[in-house]
């Protein structure tokens, strides 16, 4: 499931986009969550739809918040990444090359492999009824594919989760 949306791709200064959302992201969290931004000062320009990127970042931050009901630490990070053929060969349509990475890391409840393997499925959610549609990650997956990028999840139960968007 990755319904194609019309994308308005353009050159995006990722750090500027993240900083412009800082207040909104902070307000999305509760006081028990420490919020940190680690933005690479020499970040390359990304090619993406800025509105879809904002939506993706907000979704990831809300998911991270929900994984830390008792509080914790949430980090939004940007960095330059070179994806080599050894990595991209496992992902059809992902070309080797230079990418800007946006990641959201939390030290919340984490996810077992059985959840990670279904996380991008539409309507799949582990949240209580009425608290999640199960569409956030599937929309991010569709956006990343349509943008010729990639999204990955690294998670450990009781340790936390990092979602990386390239």
What kind of feature is each model-predicted range?
Residues 1-166:
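Core catalytic ATP-binding domain of two-component histidine kinases
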């Amino acid at each position: 499931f990755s319904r194609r949306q019309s994308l308005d791709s353009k050159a995006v200064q990722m750090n500027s986009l993240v900083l412009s959302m800082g207040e909104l992201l902070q307000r999305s969290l509760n006081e028990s969550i420490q919020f940190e931004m680690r933005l690479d000062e020499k970040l390359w320009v990304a090619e993406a739809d800025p509105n879809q990127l904002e939506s993706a970042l907000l979704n990831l931050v809300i998911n991270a918040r929900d994984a830390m009901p008792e509080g914790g630490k949430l980090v939004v990070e940007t960095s330059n990444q070179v994806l080599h053929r050894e990595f991209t060969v496992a992902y059809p349509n992902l070309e080797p090359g230079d990418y800007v990475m946006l990641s959201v890391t939390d030290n919340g409840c984490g996810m077992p492999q059985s959840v990670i393997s279904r996380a991008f499925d539409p309507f799949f959610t582990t949240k209580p009824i009425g608290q999640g549609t199960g569409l956030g990650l599937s929309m991010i997956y569709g956006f990343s594919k349509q943008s010729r990028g990639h999204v990955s999840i690294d998670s450990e139960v009781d340790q936390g989760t990092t979602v990386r968007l390239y």
